[in-house]
């Protein structure tokens, strides 16, 4: 089964393990996860115009999905090429924590495409 609460666990207090989960974007602004070496900063800024942005964090590979899934970041816009194998595991973890990955037209990012190339997308924690 996949869905909120199925992504994974993190250590809580004592020996308790807590499910990871996305967070509601804080009132003081969103944290944007972005790639260390890919993407177009100007396009990202344009896409996020009108959003209250508090900070940007950089991470490699699927770690950006994990930052959203654990509530350490709020949005991950992706410009530039990726392949399905670059995103599938992170997408599953984020979805399991309550987040989403959508193309810029707001339809769900799909898998099994000819050529296995992904379009540009935006991953989000809470909606």
Predicted region positions:
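Oxyanion/phosphate-interacting regions
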Residues: 25, 46-50, 65-127
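Acidic beta-strand-loop-alpha-helix segment within the catalytic core
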Residues: 1-65, 118-127
């Amino acid at each position: 089964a996949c869905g909120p609460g199925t992504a994974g666990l993190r250590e809580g207090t004592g020996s308790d393990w807590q499910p990871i989960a996305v967070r509601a974007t804080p009132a003081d602004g969103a944290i944007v996860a972005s790639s260390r070496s890919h993407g177009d900063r100007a396009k990202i800024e344009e896409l996020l115009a009108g959003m209250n942005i508090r900070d940007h964090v950089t991470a490699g590979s699927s770690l950006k999905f994990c930052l959203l899934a654990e509530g350490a970041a709020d949005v991950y816009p992706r410009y530039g090429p990726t392949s399905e194998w670059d995103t599938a595991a992170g997408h599953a973890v984020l979805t399991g924590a309550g987040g989403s990955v959508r193309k810029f037209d707001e339809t769900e990012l799909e898998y099994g495409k000819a050529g296995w190339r992904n379009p540009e997308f935006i991953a989000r924690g809470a909606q």
